[in-house]
């Protein structure tokens, strides 16, 4: 899967990149702001973007996801805080930032399934889907 990572903390971005590369994904680029994310997305056409909710200089991951959505790129946030339903309609969902290798990779597979239009068997505990009916279908609750 071709993935764009939008994260302003270089060490965190590199860790995410290494996890994804190790699992056979292709990281098309790492951006630390909206301008760079849009430029990379236009050039590389990623399948999805993983976006930090809070970027440097007060930039919002919501704004980045909205801009990428106009380019046809589906986004998922990662955050340390619960974003409520702020991203509903803009992103598929969010991962808690302390997701670990397995949590990240399992979440990417669920996101891939959702983008492909299939319903995954389950959700990893680190991933929350904004679409409540879909969340219920997946969790069986």
Label every model-predicted segment.
Residues 72-84, 95:
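A short, hydrophobic beta-strand element within the central beta-sheet of small alpha/beta folds
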């Amino acid at each position: 899967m071709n993935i764009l990572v939008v994260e302003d903390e270089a060490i965190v971005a590199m860790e995410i990149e290494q996890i994804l590369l190790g699992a056979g994904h292709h990281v098309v680029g790492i951006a630390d702001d909206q301008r760079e994310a849009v430029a990379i997305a236009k050039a590389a056409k990623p399948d999805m973007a993983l976006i930090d909710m809070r970027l440097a200089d007060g930039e919002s991951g919501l704004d980045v996801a909205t801009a990428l959505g106009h380019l046809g790129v589906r986004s998922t946030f990662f955050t340390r805080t619960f974003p409520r339903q702020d991203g509903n309609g803009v992103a598929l969902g969010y991962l808690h930032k302390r997701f670990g290798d397995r949590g990240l990779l399992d979440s990417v597979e669920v996101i891939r399934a959702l983008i492909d239009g299939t319903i995954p068997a389950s959700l990893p505990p680190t991933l929350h889907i904004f679409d409540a009916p879909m969340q219920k279908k997946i969790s069986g609750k």
